[in-house]
Design a protein with these regions (language model features):
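Carbohydrate-associated surface elements
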Residues: 210, 228-229
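Membrane-proximal helix-turn-helix segments that form the acceptor-binding/catalytic region
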Residues: 121-124, 128, 150, 154-158, ...
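N-terminal subdomain of nucleotide-sugar transferases
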Residues: 1-83, 223, 231, 269-271, ...
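Conserved catalytic-core segment of nucleotide-activated headgroup transferases in glycan assembly
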Residues: 231-234, 240-295, 303-311
Length: 437
């Protein structure tokens, strides 16, 4: 089987550690090629053929005879490999747009949309790349947007292979909160763009059951859920519960996640009035504001630990009792992350820790953990203290829920099971295409 990937980012395991492409396709019996739209270089052990179109090329195509798109090779010498390990997206025009978008997000994104829908592709080079590879299926993991939709339609015109999409985000619904008229203008444009673009896909994978049903109802496209896989090859080994019980959060503090951690800290302050029975360690590479530093403090049994690499994080989890999955409870961020299923959830299942999820009850990750009884679940700040008090008073619950999390992962998220799901769908659509020829 020959699989052609169309993605926004380069497949680089140094820049995007533990990414879904490597997670899904390591050991997958197939050949891979990738078309991507970022300036970085690829670095992985799975894919060998690449075609790059980036923003700099697209801008240049607007004022010169040079068209955008070229085949690139995997870095081989030490200098090229070092360059691949650095985040190329922080450089050049792409990096400039990234920085500016922090201050004026929607205008910059609309400018990027304009560049990508008016820039000129090197269609001859792209056609040669596709003809030389002859894909059996085209897979598009994406956050749908005008850039990707135009590229996907172009590739669709160059091959009769079936197209399959995956999204883990709210691509174009109106369930958002934003005061900017420009945001809603672009949202309207994307909503209509998705209606026209979804027609090229024979199947749509996504994390959220609710979103999958919405897409089937509104666009008529077949859908199903698809999650990350994890390592559940060993038998579950019960470990003793620490004293104090140790909670761990590892990840970013954005989208007001830090405010949820503050509420946990407030509950810990109450629990620990007569001695430290439960603590929270936070591992993040983000610099704290003064407000965050004051709220996330040892006074509330919250300890900031800095950043760790993936291997070190495994050791952190081995020495912890409960791993946290948290999202913001404010309306804007609740809606923004509603259909997002953090890829870390599967890692937490395999971590040997119990999981505590503090999220909105319509968040798809929360719903999944709750429906599978794979975590302690809290959907209201006022319920954090009672839940933590219950755990402190009954430490054996930690062991019980650590096992439940692991068994859920073992039942639903082994590499064999997830890869079989992907392969079966790809083979089904390839066979259907051949039958119709």
């Amino acid at each position: 089987m020959k699989i052609l990937l169309i993605t926004a980012e380069e497949w680089n395991d140094y820049v995007y550690g533990n990414g879904v492409l490597t997670n899904w396709f390591t050991g997958f019996d197939a050949e891979f090629a990738q078309i991507y739209t970022s300036p970085g270089l690829p670095s992985n052990k799975v894919c060998n053929k690449y075609f790059q179109i980036d923003e700099r090329q697209m801008v240049k195509s607007l004022y010169s005879n040079t068209k955008a798109g070229r085949e690139v090779k995997m870095p081989t010498n030490e200098r090229e490999q070092d360059a691949a390990k650095s985040n190329a997206q922080r450089k050049g025009i792409y990096g400039l747009f990234k920085k500016l978008s922090l201050w004026m997000h929607t205008p910059i994104v609309m400018l990027q949309d304009f560049i990508w829908i008016t820039g000129r592709y090197d269609k001859v080079a792209l056609q040669l790349f596709i003809d030389g590879y002859k894909p059996d299926v085209v897979f598009c993991p994406q956050l749908g947007n005008p850039k990707m939709w135009r590229l996907e339609k172009l590739v669709k015109s160059m091959t009769n292979a079936p197209f399959i999409a995956f999204t883990g985000d709210d691509e174009a619904s109106y369930q958002q909160v934003n005061k900017s008229p420009l945001f809603w203008l672009r949202r309207w444009y994307c909503h209509n763009g998705l209606k026209n673009s979804v027609k090229i896909f024979s199947h749509y994978f996504m994390h959220s059951k609710e979103q999958a049903q919405d897409y089937t109802n509104e666009y008529g496209v077949p859908t199903s859920t698809l999650y990350k896989c994890g390592d559940f090859s060993n038998e579950f080994v019960k470990k003793s519960v620490g004293s104090p019980i140790r909670l761990v959060y590892a990840g970013r503090l954005y989208c007001n996640r830090w405010k949820t951690l503050v509420e946990i800290g407030k509950a810990l302050h109450e629990i620990n009035k007569h001695g430290e029975r439960m603590v929270l360690d936070i591992y993040t590479q983000e610099a704290l504001t003064n407000e965050q530093r004051k709220a996330l403090s040892p006074e509330n049994s919250v300890y900031m630990k800095g950043s760790v690499n993936p291997q070190q994080l495994k050791e952190v989890y081995r020495n912890a009792d409960i791993a946290l999955h948290v999202e913001s409870m404010d309306k804007k961020n609740r809606l923004a992350t509603r259909v997002s299923f953090s890829t870390k959830i599967i890692d937490l299942m395999a971590s040997s820790c119990a999981i505590l999820a503090v999220c909105w009850n319509r968040h798809c990750g929360y719903q999944y953990l709750r429906d599978n009884d794979a975590a302690f679940c809290v959907d209201n700040y006022s319920d954090i203290l009672p839940m933590l008090q219950r755990i402190v008073d009954n430490p054996s619950l930690v062991q019980n829920y650590a096992q439940k999390a692991y068994e859920c992962g073992r039942k639903n998220h082994t590499r064999e099971k997830i890869q079989k799901q992907i392969r079966d769908k790809f083979e089904e659509l390839i066979a259907k295409k051949h039958a119709n020829e």
